[in-house]
Amino acid sequence: MAKKSLKVKAARVAKFSTRAYTRCQLCGRPHAVLRKFEICRICFRKLAHEGKIPGLKKASW
């Protein structure tokens, strides 16, 4: 879990666009965040396995 201060810092509007970065909305992880869902790959996988993301199912070919 990220510190509360880091979550607040990431939520602020950056002075320069290159300083802005995404954080997971659930756990606060700064890396491997899926922009479409705004959550990290770990939380995405967990929610997908639990069936909490509508329209998403495991690929099989």
Swiss-Prot record:
It comes from Mycoplasmopsis pulmonis (strain UAB CTIP). Pfam families: Ribosomal_S14 (PF00253). Part of the 30S ribosomal subunit. Contacts proteins S3 and S10. Belongs to the universal ribosomal protein uS14 family. Zinc-binding uS14 subfamily. It comes from the Bacteria. The keyword rRNA-binding applies. The gene is rpsZ. Keywords: Metal-binding, Ribonucleoprotein, Ribosomal protein, RNA-binding, rRNA-binding, Zinc. Binds 1 zinc ion per subunit. Its cofactor is Zn(2+). Binds 16S rRNA, required for the assembly of 30S particles and may also be responsible for determining the conformation of the 16S rRNA at the A site. PANTHER family: 30S RIBOSOMAL PROTEIN S14, SMALL RIBOSOMAL SUBUNIT PROTEIN US14M. This is Small ribosomal subunit protein uS14. One of its GO terms (cellular component) is cytoplasm.
